[in-house]
């Protein structure tokens, strides 16, 4: 059991999510052009992760970076096993309003290896192709080309129609911190039901197995959790 940033995290080590799995039927190999695209899309001026490699190094290395990272990503793609360094994060609590000593008054950012972001972006792009087919038009959160204005326009249209036909209308606004409360095993089941290839789900599953993190509230970091 570990207490991180005021929230208790408990993992049952007999849970299936802890065991690395391998799928025999693989999706098509990762291309060098995909690695190049991922490198070019990584935001610069970001703090390095635990490996200390700055993101600004990649443009300097150019084609050499593409070739090396393509080899690493392809190895992960085939074996479905991630380097442990890519499973490590550094949590930095950022105070919001109120007492900064209260964990609930802080938001957390996670620093990860910039090299790992290449593989993550490629995996995200492949998953997005399947997810976009399943999501309804009203789902705007975390979708490219959609945002608050898109939802406001939808609400305006709904209100207009309700008034036109003299219908009652009710709105329920919920703001819940649910991103870290998702049951992973249920998530894998849902992805399978959505038609996501087992290979992609396996990569995600093995990424989240044996995750490690340190908390850096100031100049010093805690031991790995």
List the model feature ranges, each with a label.
Residues 1-104, 110, 114-118, 135:
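Surface-exposed loop/turn segments and immediately adjacent short secondary-structure elements
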Residues 45-53, 101-111, 149-192:
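Conserved catalytic palm subdomain of right-hand nucleotidyl-transferase polymerases, strongest
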Residues 51, 70, 103, 132, ...:
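Intrinsically disordered, low-complexity regions enriched in proline, serine, glycine
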Residues 58, 66-70, 112, 116, ...:
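Hydrophobic face of alpha-helices
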Residues 87-102, 129-131, 213-225:
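Active-site-adjacent bridging/hinge elements
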Residues 176-225:
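Conserved polymerase palm-domain catalytic core
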